[in-house]
């Protein structure tokens, strides 16, 4: 039967199962059980629920099944007809569509052969057990829930935000010995089928003993594995993952990992944050512009400083040039050695801060940086201006929302230090040209990394209102072109505005 028509629950259990399968095919997170109930085990039934949302052993569902198992078939049907289950919140649905909606609220749905209604047996719904707060993707406004190590729990967190039967959770296995559960989450009528097939093919193209984290999947499935720029977007936020799914993208989640992989992705996706869409467009645009500038300076600022001080001092105002010269008096090293000393010190502090326990790690990063910088200046190992430049560069890298994306700029920073120390501004231009050329040839599952500036026609570009600037939410009426969704329109109003 068409999904747009109301389908009554039938007394024929087989027909009800077929109708539920129409909605929940390719849903590895939906538990479907056919069983026999009754004292004589002669009453066929079909039970379905989101796996992590119901505990059959201790919940109301378990008590209900135990009660029905003590009755005869006629008594079971009579009990259901008279609504005498003894559960105050039990709901009876006359149509399949209502049963589908009830299932997506996190409750269990029971069909009994010979009974023309579906029974929703109340439970705790979507639980909070095991859900952690996100540390790596802090937002000013929005949910604090984060993914955990259970792939089933993570899929339920996405379903909690998108209660549609069109959300599919395709289950795969990875690792010959580990046999790790991998889920592909997408919206059936939005995600491009070719994209889903390509992702599934890439994930099955290799054989390995074990997959212990989603990072291993990421490295094995990337085509241009040598690039410092990630071709998979990572997230620990269920709301970020749900937002990507609604754009027509696909989420890859791996058991024992709290990190979801978003595909395809592009440069701009790494700059956006979840609260860009929860805040007013003026605030979101300002923050986004800062992050774009931060990504540029995190890569080029130390190299720019070396180019100015070593090759192009004539472009500086005289007073500023004298200030630079005075600051470097007594420093025994050339400028490039100064910069490398401070950069490596900051990177070492950052690494130490990550490895140490929470509060201690933060203390090492902040206090250690201040102490080392001050001591280095007082010992005439580096000039104060270098400490300022390196500190500002570190701040810029912290402003980039995605850690893997920020790491790419941290690596390229040393490339720019080398070419600028050797060739000055000419080296800076060559470096920028090399990075831009690399980015223009980089793709994520066939989607250009610099979309829509590369690989899109003018109409696609005009449709996009969500890049460096974020236009008012009411104007963001089309899904991004880079995901190539089946349906582009995502927002309509009843009256023209």
Region annotations inferred by a language model:
Residues 304, 317-497:
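Generic detector of multi-pass transmembrane helix bundles and their immediately adjacent loops
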